[in-house]
Curated annotation (Swiss-Prot):
Phosphorylated in its cytoplasmic tail. TRAP proteins are part of a complex whose function is to bind calcium to the ER membrane and thereby regulate the retention of ER resident proteins. It comes from the Eukaryota. It is a single-pass type I membrane protein. Keywords: Calcium, Endoplasmic reticulum, Glycoprotein, Membrane, Phosphoprotein, Signal, Transmembrane, Transmembrane helix. This is Translocon-associated protein subunit alpha.
């Protein structure tokens, strides 16, 4: 009889231990639970709606958070990671966690902006992207992954292209035209001319050769004129 009682006690102890373990596991699951019925999410990549992200460039995602619960919820963090496209458990890059601390009352909506930068050294190819949001209801913390999909990393666009070149040329031409118009309308300075005074006494000297040339073909040409000097003085 004693053996039977001892056996029953042992069975009860084993059952009690198993039940206790089940309760602990359930509690852990509740802490990590994500009650999707209490919240709803929306998102958009305003500059990358085709989900093509340039390596080394800022990527912005706008997250819509609607509180469907019967009490206020506090948004604490948003974080993201780049993963292997075939195995999302393989992390390639973890991005900076964004701190928010925004309280959303029941029945209200909030929009948050989260930004991250894929490394400029990433090869242009397909990657997996996870973006998650953490929030709390005052007693428990919850995590919701609202984006879980593949994206494409592309080469970073050059900062200078032909469109930029023509825009620069157009701008320079416009500035040059404005400058030319302004310069043409500016008053020009008058040039000051220096007028030299003419001496009232004019002196003309004629040599023998000049006189001979002037008298060539006349009767006076035969006369030998050694030198003629005429001084003409104008009356004052």
């Amino acid at each position: 009889m004693n053996k039977l009682i001892t056996l029953l006690l042992a069975v009860l102890m084993i059952i009690s231990c198993v039940y206790s373990d089940d309760v602990e596991i359930t509690d852990d699951e509740v802490v990590q639970a994500t009650p999707t019925s209490d919240v709803s999410f929306s998102y958009i990549f305003p500059d990358n709606q085709d989900k093509n992200f340039a390596a080394g460039s800022v990527v912005e995602v706008l997250v819509g958070f609607t509180n469907n619960a019967d009490k206020a919820l506090n948004i604490t963090h948003i974080f993201a990671s780049l993963n292997h496209p075939q195995d999302f458990s393989v992390f390639i890059q973890n991005y900076t966690r964004g701190d928010f601390g925004i309280a959303v009352e029941k029945g209200h909506h909030a929009t948050l902006a989260y930004r991250f930068v894929p490394s400029e050294y990433l090869e242009p190819r397909e990657f997996g992207l996870l973006i998650s949001l953490e929030y709390q209801d005052g007693a428990q913390n919850f995590t919701q992954t609202f984006f879980n999909s593949t994206i494409n990393i592309t080469e970073k666009e050059t900062s200078f292209d032909m469109d930029s070149f023509f825009l620069i040329l157009l701008g320079l031409g416009f500035v040059g035209g404005i400058g030319y118009i302004v310069y043409g309308k500016m008053p020009k300075q008058k040039k000051v001319r220096t007028v030299s005074k003419v001496n009232k006494n004019a002196v003309r000297v004629e040599t023998e050769d000049e006189t001979a040339e002037w008298l060539s073909g006349t009767s006076a040409a035969s006369s030998k004129v050694k030198s003629v000097q005429k001084v003409v003085k104008k009356n004052k």
